[in-house]
Amino acid sequence: MQITSRFTIAVHALAFIDLFQDKQRVTCNALASSIQVNPVIIRTVLSKLKEAGIIDARQGSGGSRLARPLNEISLYDIYKAVDTVDETGLFHFHENPHPKCVVGGNIHKALDDKIQRVQDTMEDELRKITMADVVDDLTKEMNRRGQSV
């Protein structure tokens, strides 16, 4: 599969931004500490989220804020912003199966539409889930553990 960790890093970052944007400046270093990745990765992800109009981020230590309400940010929006799948789709099909082999010559006809259905289904599910859903579940878990921001 071609989905990278950028997707879950972006979801984590957006949840963090939502919970802390009114309490402190949300910097790349704060996000990197929470997510446990290099700040360079955070900057790359935030840049893509900013390009997609999901966050407002200021250069330097200006911090990041949400540009849209959580219920207007779907997981699909995030996926498309940070983990764009190229024209080959989610699954990269080996390019040159042997055309004279009984399997190689027919595998694309047998598998291509199924793979596309899997990708379409995944994308449809991502469209149904918003960051509001994620932060709601996150807050419930924090409350269950007696944690707060």
Please annotate each region the language model reported.
Residues 1-14:
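Short alpha-helical segments that sit at the start of domains
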Residues 45-50:
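Basic amphipathic alpha-helical segments that dock to polyanions
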